[in-house]
Amino acid sequence: MPEELTPTPETAVVEAGPVSRWLSENGFENTALERDHLGVEIVQVDREVLLPIAAALFAYGFNYLQCQGGYDLGPGQDLVSFYHLTKVSDDASQPQEVRVKVFLPRHDPKVPPVFWIWKGADWQERETFDMYGIQFEGHPNLKRILMPEDWVGWPLRKDYISPDFYELQDAY
């Protein structure tokens, strides 16, 4: 008798949530990922379709960018840019939320900015650039926001090696 294959977290099929289904029904390619511990739907998209999908989600009612950030999956692995969106309205007792993730190759971490859709992304994208080196191509003011301008490297990458010494210059 053949052995049954037990699905692992890597092979388990994730049921598409309402946002993923809506995107698919409207011709936007996406992949449903497992919901987070709070039950927030997570959708993976390619960087080439991030802007059209972001604009569609804004038109669909996701009018608030709660958070934009990044993280590193580990040395030699992808970097991730994520966008936590919320539908804010006067009559919502429980606002709908979705998290959009874009997985970027470490050697080419480029993605378009969503600043043009949600103005609050401005400094959040700059922080993600500053800490992880994710390039938001077309951002109007993409420069370091936390680290000194002459800092070398991306401090929150898991393969970052801290310098032994860095001398801060007086501002005056």
From Swiss-Prot:
Its EC number is 7.1.1.-. It catalyses: a plastoquinone + NADH + (n+1) H(+)(in) = a plastoquinol + NAD(+) + n H(+)(out); a plastoquinone + NADPH + (n+1) H(+)(in) = a plastoquinol + NADP(+) + n H(+)(out). InterPro entries: NADH_DH_suC, NADH_quin_OxRdtase_su_C/D-like, NADH_UbQ_OxRdtase_30kDa_su, NADH_UbQ_OxRdtase_CS. It is a peripheral membrane protein. GO terms for cellular component: plasma membrane-derived thylakoid membrane. This is NAD(P)H-quinone oxidoreductase subunit J. NDH-1 shuttles electrons from an unknown electron donor, via FMN and iron-sulfur (Fe-S) centers, to quinones in the respiratory and/or the photosynthetic chain. The immediate electron acceptor for the enzyme in this species is believed to be plastoquinone. Couples the redox reaction to proton translocation, and thus conserves the redox energy in a proton gradient. Cyanobacterial NDH-1 also plays a role in inorganic carbon-concentration. It comes from Synechococcus sp. (strain ATCC 27144 / PCC 6301 / SAUG 1402/1). The gene is ndhJ. NDH-1 can be composed of about 15 different subunits; different subcomplexes with different compositions have been identified which probably have different functions.
